[in-house]
């Protein structure tokens, strides 16, 4: 039987809820995968685990939320136990180069951490599924695939999956999300 589950929706620091609530800091140029913001997210997740008396925590993040999830796993080990990363810009410098070329402007994100640089902090055996839509022209599949391959080489139970026909936004409606979350939970509670 499945353990009791609580689902909590979080907004990244500096972003606003529909009610206008916000916390943290977001750079006007979106360069906000900072160490301080990752510490805020990790602190909030720790507080939620305590409040709900949670044994395990599975993160599900899209785009910047996926990068944040990958960073929390590596920079704050033990806060979360598994993750589903959807459309992850998991290798920030080449992703920024790609986005800048698409837009014909911009520069590097000098304040942001790169999830690839924190893979070694993720405890071995942590289950992670990284998924990118095959039609995603924002966070190209290669960024999440590279992260998953390097994480697996370090002992993380990571794998990459392609969501055929989906783009950066529509991957949020990928029909297999529920199944993948259930698989991650089953890995944590065999």
Task: Tell me what each language-model feature is.
Residues 145, 149-190:
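C-terminal catalytic histidine-bearing segment of alpha/beta-hydrolase fold enzymes
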Residues 54-101:
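Primarily recognizes the serine-hydrolase "nucleophile elbow" in alpha/beta-hydrolase
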Residues 91-154:
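The feature captures the conserved acid-bearing segment of alpha/beta-hydrolase catalytic domains
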Residues 31-39, 138-142, 175:
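Soluble non-cytosolic domains of exported or imported proteins
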Residues 1-27, 31:
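Active-site machinery of serine-nucleophile hydrolases
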Residues 13-17, 64-67, 89-92, 134-138, ...:
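Solvent-exposed loop/turn segments at secondary-structure junctions
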Residues 25-51:
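Alpha/beta-hydrolase active-site loop
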Residues 8-10, 82-86, 129-131, 161:
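Hydrophobic/aromatic beta-strand patches that form the interior of the parallel beta-sheet core
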